[in-house]
Each structure stands twice: as C-alpha cells, then as structure tokens.
Amino acid sequence: MGLPRTSADSVLFSSYNVLNLFQDDTPAGREHYRLIVESVRALDTDVLAVQEIRAPDGKSARARLRQLADDAGMRCTVPGRAGGAGRSALAMGPHGYHAGLLWRDGIEPVPGSFRGYGKGDFWHSLACVTLDAGGPRVRYAAHHATPFGRQLRADQNERLVAALTNPRGGRPAIVGADWNTECADRVRDEDSGEWVLYEPRDPFAGLGWFDELIYQCEWDYDKRGRRRHRADRRPGDVLWAGGLHDVAAVLRAPWQATAGHHPDDSYGVRGISRRIDGIRVTRQLLGGLLSYGVEDTELTRRASDHLPVTVEYVPPAAAPASAAPSVPTTAPAPAAGERGRA
C-alpha cells in the first residue's frame, strides 16, 4: 500500500484529513485513532500534511500532533533559530480544527522556518515549514479551507497564494489540503490547442436542490423562476490563476474521488463523490512531478471521510527544466481588424 516510489532521488508528499482526530476518548474514538495511525504507517510517505487535529487549546493540540507523529514513526518538531526552543509544526485554527506537518527520520527541518497562520487569516489554518530532504530546500504546507462561504473561500485562497508564492522567486512550495471546493485547473487539449478544464465533471449536476448547496454552488433562475445550480469553481480558479498548480491536473491523472465514501459525509449519502483533497505546487516544482495517487483501500475508507493523496516528485535541481509542462499566459490583444468580433 502507498504510492510506489519510482526514483531513488524522489520525495513522497501526502495529504490527509483525519476526521476529527482526538475529538473524544471513547472506545470508538480510540479505534478511530488506531485506524488513522495504521493508515499513515501504510502510506509510507516522506512528508505528510494533516488536517482536523482536534483540540481546545494550543498546548494540547501540539501534544496531540507529537503523539500522532510518535505513533506513526515520524517527526514534527522544528528547532528554533540559533539553538532556541523547538516547536511542533502545527497551526492553530480558530474553530478547533488544526493543521500540521509530519516527516520521516532523515529529513531535516530548517531551524526557525515554521510559520503558522490561523485566526485573522483563515477559517481553519495554514502550517508551513522548510524541509531539507536532499537537494534544494522546499517549503511544505498543510491547509484546510473553509467549509462555508464561497466568496470567503476564494478570498482566503488569495491569502494562501500570497503566503506561498511571495516573495517572487522564493523557495519552491508544495501544499496538501482539504480544499473544500472543485478544481478549476485547465490543461491543453493537444488536438484543438485550447485550454480546457482538467475536471469538467460537475458533481452536483442533475441533482435536486438541497440547502447545503449554498456552500458549493452558484445558482440563478430560469424564466419560470426555477432554480438552476452549478459548481462554483471560482475558489479553485484563484489557486490556479495565482500559480499553485494541482498535481493531478499537471500529470493528467485519471479522476478519482477523495470524498463521498463515508457514512458521515452529508454529500456522500446523497450519492455525491468529490475530489476535494489535493496537492498543489509552485511552478519551480512542475518539471519534477513523477506520479500522483489516491489511497483508496478498505482501511482508509473506514478511517476517515477523506482519502489520503500522495505525489512523488524529484527536487528542482534533479528535474530538467525542459520537463516542465507549459502553462497558459494571457492571450494577446486582438488585432485592430478583429476587435468587436464575437
């Protein structure tokens, strides 16, 4: 189990929403924790972004991330600068859901590189740390997007882009997240030359309206006043237009759902399957992307309402620049004789 490694020089990076981990200490809660630990170990990944570490305060949240790291055979402590006190790579979310990063032995966090963004920036949080996994150092991030407010989600995705892509020409970055939205990345159609949606499927198409669709869909009304709805891709488009590229789209991976399988998923019980968990990279890493996969097993289906996703990549110095896929740029202005044509 786990994404097979195809290169001795590669790094495996995974993202996993662990479904209210540590929410309670009941027998069911302890069994849930056991399943999550077993799932993480089975991933056999190098770096892991996690979402939904539950805790009422910072001290207990950081302790719980350390517990998960210890039980999964990973690490999560970033040393301070100049030998200062270290800290767990966890970003507190203002609503009790926290995001963090784990990594295997042999990967070294850059002292003082941890950054956590929560209240005032995001509905949940963003955790970032620079890791040395061989080759150029890369900034890794874990994020959990807001489940409510489509415009808020788009606005906070702008904040995320700013945090991971500035300053211009800075470190390459890779982020694993529960995006809570549909992908809007485009890929070049080799026959027509047009840039088309990688993921044209609308998971809400053909379904009758229900109240929770206000969090995911745009809508209007026909001449008879009947409501028409469609997936709101604007939050996803902010990410792609801002220079954070969905690895699945870049690699043209076959579409595979990450949510909709679990009995606690209010969309899934209506037959809706979605790919809302994913990994995005800045342009510096595009040429090093090797493979992508969703860990869809009986174990991961039982453990969480989200399936873990993994990407294999080689650091920028080991990836030939010519391997980087093309990305669209702004189209040139039409010639004078073409202006005004439909």
Feature-to-residue mapping (PLM):
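Metal-dependent phosphoesterases centered on the DNase I-like endonuclease/exonuclease/phosphatase
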Residues: 158-272, 283, 337
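Conserved beta strand-loop-helix elements of the APE1-like EEP
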Residues: 91-110, 232, 236-243, 267-288, ...
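Short proline/glycine-enriched turn/loop segments at secondary-structure junctions
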Residues: 89-90, 265-270, 298-303
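Short hydrophobic/aromatic beta-strand or adjacent loop that forms the aromatic wall/cage
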Residues: 96-99, 121-128, 273-278, 304-310
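Surface polyanion/phosphate-binding segment centered on an Asp-His-Pro turn
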Residues: 176, 295, 299, 304-342
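Acidic/histidine-rich helix-loop elements
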Residues: 15-32, 149
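Active-site beta-strand/loop signature of hydrolases that rely on acidic residues for catalysis
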Residues: 13-18, 36-61, 140-141, 160-191, ...
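Structured beta-strand-rich core segments of catalytic domains in phosphoester-bond hydrolases
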Residues: 2, 29, 53-137
